[in-house]
Regions:
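Lectin-like carbohydrate-binding module/patch detector with strong preference for beta-trefoil
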Residues: 2-219
Length: 219
């Protein structure tokens, strides 16, 4: 009888629906707040409270490419970025972005990709970050790995972006530009992971997470 009593709870557990046992399926399904491929969003640097930004202003030194900055305003249309994969087939619209996945961030208004390379940044002498390419097509220096702690990049998470080609982290340390982009902050790459390179998804149009890219809705 004692062994029968021990077996009864195990048999009951086996008969329960999986929906009543959420811990057994943890990590298989994306949470409703997962950031997805194709979503358009703004990214807030959590240390300096500025949003990742670009515009049709080129650097006067270094690469001479389109500049990338941080702005305090939350309503600036030049702060929207589209989430894309290393290729369009690797990150279909509506697919949740996994921690450790390489993505591209394409500036919506100019069609250029977030980019870095071995040029010094103009103010802090870290690594220059620019916007590069045409109509969303650039080169292999446009790839960034999303670093987060779970299975998927969640909207509530503070995440890091580590550059695939040069291994720097997308960062802000507070330096401000003068004319013609007075008050905007320098965005650059830093070799070390620290509190200057945490980012959080903010305003935007998010595609509802789905493991089946054919089934999605905009939120």
């Amino acid at each position: 009888m004692r062994s029968g009593r021990r077996l009864f709870p195990l048999l009951l557990l086996a008969l329960l629906p999986l929906a009543l046992l959420p811990g057994l399926c943890h990590g298989r399904e994306p949470a409703p707040g997962a950031v997805t491929c194709g979503s358009v969003l703004k990214l807030l640097n959590t240390r300096h409270s500025v949003r990742l930004h670009s515009h049709e202003v080129k650097y006067g030194s270094g690469s001479g490419q389109q500049s990338v900055t941080g702005v305090e305003a939350s309503d600036d249309a030049n702060s929207y970025w589209r989430i894309r994969g290393k290729s369009d087939s690797s990150c279909q619209r509506g697919t949740p972005v996994k921690c450790g996945q390489a993505i591209r961030l394409t500036h919506v208004n100019t069609g250029k990709n977030l980019h870095t390379h071995h040029f010094p940044s103009p103010l802090s002498n870290n690594q220059e970050v620019s916007a590069f390419g045409d109509d969303g097509e650039g080169d292999d220096l446009d790839f960034w790995i999303v670093q987060c702690s779970g299975t998927y990049w969640e909207r509530e998470d503070a995440v890091r972006f580590k550059h695939v080609g040069t291994e720097v982290f997308l960062s802000i340390t507070g330096e401000q530009y003068g004319h013609p982009i007075r008050g905007q902050r320098e965005v650059h790459g830093m070799p070390a992971a620290n509190h200057h390179n945490y980012w959080k998804a903010m305003e935007g149009v998010f595609i509802k997470p789905s493991l089946d890219p054919a089934k999605h809705d905009e939120l």
